[in-house]
């Protein structure tokens, strides 16, 4: 309290009426009247002295004022403390990790020792330069510090400096910190000369290679591991012998596991890491994984110069990776080890390889040799390049290339994810798949260049080469598939996908079946398919009689085979061991049969397998329940680093109106098909594991839909339903709050291919050719549900994938064909077997 305001001797001008106190005292008798002064008679009496008023600054008032002062002081102190805590809590730290190459300073061995005078001096110099860059930038008031973590040699000469940058700012302003913005400040500070046509510029006296500058957001845990005093499970290896294998082994049975292995080889050589086995029970591929980096700090795979490969599943298959420089970082993370986690691996120093050759093809109409990606059978590193020249012995012969689990197609405007091929001045993109293809070049002289991806390490490639007759690519009596394979003409239009791309089953003339012929009775595609095609029904007779097993027969658990198609979970026991009806507790019949364009509001409980997937709280995609823990959706919903992280995702089950789900669970794990192609939407399928299994008490509102049997046969014109909360019309700006349903029909595959041209055997079309009913934005990943007539169960025939617009005439929706992925689903969800 201000002392001047409480002092009774303050000036009268400061007094207020409220400062005056009146004391009323009760006394007996009448109040004395005021006496008039008398004139003195004789000697005057002495006048009485007035009573002294009690002073204001007495002991009692002092105690009161002191108590008030203490109270105000306590309130003020508490308020200031709360404001400080609140201000501190509302600020976030942002971590960025990067590196650049200094070209005008030679590497010293002492730089490997972080306690050495040489390292500390160099680190101080670089930190001062980085400090000056950011303290004079637009982010100066948020900049906190920079820390040099490593100074290493590299195959291009000079020093490779790895560093961290830390910013601190209010949480509300965190959105302004984009990777591009922070990196641009550093790059713009490098002064380059127009006359100097190299990538080297000047940064505060340091000669820095512009092309080497890499900077992106990092994790706080990685920062703490890199600069903390307790490095825990971290090791630095320097390898200088070419013939040695340096072991890397780590294991843990409990607790937290966070290990960093920094591998450095002698200048001019590369590192090959070979992983023999890894044991890891991953919650997701972000927090639980083994990751390989082409640097000494964990810089993500999105960086141009760096590669990263993440493993988050147990494996005992040997895998090896090659660096692009003389260094590599291996990290193993698991925040909570339940059983056993660890790796057994080794690394070695290898020389750089040139990938080029000139080959004279001598054989005629056969494959005579092999070429491969660099460092085969290792994953080949980013930015690699190969050149091959082929020459045939005759001008009538061309070059045939047989790719294993790979295909090349003409390059589009979208670019190439897995590098590009230039073949006789024509550009192609490569993509991985689950079958072989043949690519033919009708020229006796062929120049081929493979330019590897600039960002990714890719699976090894093995290509057989040979010659072929340009005028007759396939032998007489054979059909040439779109995949390049040649199959016997007799296998065309037989109902079996012999070409792997269904090209042998397209544009087939539908004729009345010759029911009485022996060929039809034994091998016809309409035999035992569940549809009666012959008037007497003979095509559906004796379908469960035991016959020798082929690729067209159904196989029971005891290896007995028969002709019946779609026998799995059809409600009829066909196998003696009942294996065809095991694990079939899915999809009760919907009681109602009355992103969806042209659809109507469904009724609650109609589609109990429908799921809404929310990303950061907003509806983003659909999915289908296939078990108590697993969902099935589309891979394109999770494309990219941000969307592939399960942390922001939640699954809303048993929901009719958006926001009113009966059960909500975080997503524990996202498994995207390894061959997914974001350019063509091939292999557009993904599995999601829930963190919490939905309870059995909600089975009336949540139920799994049945997975189709392998190679399920469907017929065009069959009625199915597409459901979702997507847009009702293409022009709508947001989705529907109520679950929509629309009846569609399966479209003939030939019509589908004729419409879009890029349809693979892993896709199917459904819709209404008039355009009245279709899926739309927001329905992606949702189910295409078809009801089986034999038992009334619902089958997940398709997954909403892509299409041209929404509900446009003559452009049906394209769906992922689930029956082609049943073995892949069983690999992760064996309980469905």
From Swiss-Prot:
Gene Ontology terms for molecular function: serine-type endopeptidase activity; serine-type peptidase activity
Gene3D superfamilies, alphabetized: Low-density Lipoprotein Receptor, SEA domain, Spermadhesin, CUB domain, Trypsin-like serine proteases
Domain Peptidase S1 span(s) in chain numbering: 596-830
Region of interest: Disordered: 30-49
Coiled coil: none
Extracellular side: 84-829
SUPFAM superfamilies: LDL receptor-like module, SEA domain, Spermadhesin, CUB domain, Trypsin-like serine proteases
Record-annotated CUB domain positions: 233-350, 355-471
Compartments in which it is found: Cell membrane
Signal peptide extent: none
Domain SEA, residue spans: 92-220
Entry EC no(s): 3.4.21.-
EC class: hydrolase
Biased composition (Basic residues): 32-49
The keyword Transmembrane is assigned to this record: yes
Quaternary structure (record): Forms a heterodimer with SERPINA5.
Protein name: Transmembrane protease serine 7
